[in-house]
């Protein structure tokens, strides 16, 4: 596993050097329309200890300084920007219109009337609801308005859960399809909120939990399928593993998936400290450059590693099903 992570880190470093040539020197943007390219690269570089404020002399945070640019991409823009800024507790770029509060307000402003979030329209989608909740999770105890929005979304997700414990999405045709990615996004969000997606009664349907549902997509000796009758899928595998990593980190009392402040200071440099177990998170009911997927995978799996996730989360659950 260490050899694999070393290779991935080396490849990510090489890719980061190539990305330098794609940065607009005037704006710090990696893409003229997609702010998420900056956000995701910030996450990836933070995970491997690279200084995001000096990528070939350019500050990737600056690419997120214009709120209108961040919002231009739709709901994904503010969500990923907030995740990126919080990943290393980065200061908000100066001289711009983006602030953490502005990002939070924008996310809250597009909550659907039924309680979740959507790519477009006013009908909650499990994927976008999961992503929004993951970004807002750190503010649950700090902001009553955020708490109210999250509580409403948690209730909506429980209602949206499929009869087997999984989640479905629609591709705009009105038909819902159960996918591993939808289930993975919900698992990631619940883990960030301190909700056990394997035992919380709100997320168990007919004896099946969110974790149970996700593991049904697993292919022995391989990865995860996108849909139940499909084959191993790259995106399905990526999202399932990082969701399980998020769940592992929740069970272990570590920071949530995108919060790297336990090992990385606000400057993006790795510090030699042992991660500490944070106080338990209050469950909601109680209180033109496309970044390769494997770069983001470094960010995701660096905190635990595939072997750890499989050994602690996946194997016991699969064995339990055989008993």
Where are these regions (language model features)?
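An alpha-helical repeat/solenoid feature that recognizes helix-turn-helix modules
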Residues: 1-2, 26-53, 70-96, 100, ...
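Ser/Thr/Asn(+Pro)-rich, low-complexity disordered segments
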Residues: 2-3, 313
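Helix-turn-helix repeat elements of alpha-solenoid scaffolds
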Residues: 3-13, 53-59, 98-99
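Alpha-helical scaffold repeats of the Armadillo/HEAT/TPR superfamily
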Residues: 59-62, 98, 103, 149-153, ...
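Asp-box/WD-like beta-propeller blade repeats and closely related beta-sheet repeat scaffolds
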Residues: 60-74
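C-terminal low-complexity, Ser/Thr- and acidic/Pro-rich disordered "stalk" regions positioned immediately N-terminal
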Residues: 251, 255-293
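C-terminal membrane-anchoring or membrane-association module
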Residues: 302-323
């Amino acid at each position: 596993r260490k050899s694999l992570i070393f290779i991935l880190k080396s490849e990510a470093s090489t890719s980061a050097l190539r990305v330098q040539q794609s940065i607009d020197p005037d704006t710090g943007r990696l893409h003229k329309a997609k702010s998420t390219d900056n956000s995701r690269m910030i996450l990836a570089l933070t995970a491997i200890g690279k200084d995001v404020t000096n990528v070939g002399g350019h500050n990737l945070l600056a690419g997120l300084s214009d709120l209108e640019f961040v919002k231009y991409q739709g709901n994904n823009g503010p969500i990923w920007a907030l995740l990126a800024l919080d990943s290393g507790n980065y200061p908000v770029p100066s001289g711009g219109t983006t602030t953490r509060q502005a990002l939070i307000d924008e996310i809250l402003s597009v909550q659907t009337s039924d309680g979740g979030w959507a790519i477009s329209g006013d009908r909650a989608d499990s994927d976008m609801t999961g992503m929004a909740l993951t970004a807002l999770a750190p503010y649950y105890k700090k902001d009553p308005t955020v708490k109210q929005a999250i509580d409403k979304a948690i209730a909506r997700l429980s209602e949206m859960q499929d009869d087997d414990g999984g989640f479905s999405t629609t591709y705009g045709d009105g038909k819902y399809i159960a996918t591993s990615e939808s289930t993975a996004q919900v698992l990631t969000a619940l883990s960030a909120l301190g909700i056990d997606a394997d035992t919380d009664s709100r997320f168990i349907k007919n004896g099946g939990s969110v974790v149970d549902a996700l593991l049904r997509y697993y292919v022995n000796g391989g990865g995860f399928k996108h849909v139940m009758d499909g084959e191993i899928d790259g995106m399905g595998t990526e999202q399932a593993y990082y969701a399980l990593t998020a769940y592992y980190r929740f069970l272990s009392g570590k920071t949530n998936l995108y919060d790297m402040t336990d090992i990385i200071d606000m400057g993006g440099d790795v510090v030699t400290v042992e991660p500490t177990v944070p106080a338990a998170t209050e469950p909601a009911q109680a209180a033109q450059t496309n970044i390769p997927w494997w770069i983001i995978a470094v960010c995701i799996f660096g905190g635990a590693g595939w072997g750890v996730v499989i050994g602690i989360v996946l194997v016991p659950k699969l064995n339990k099903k055989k008993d």
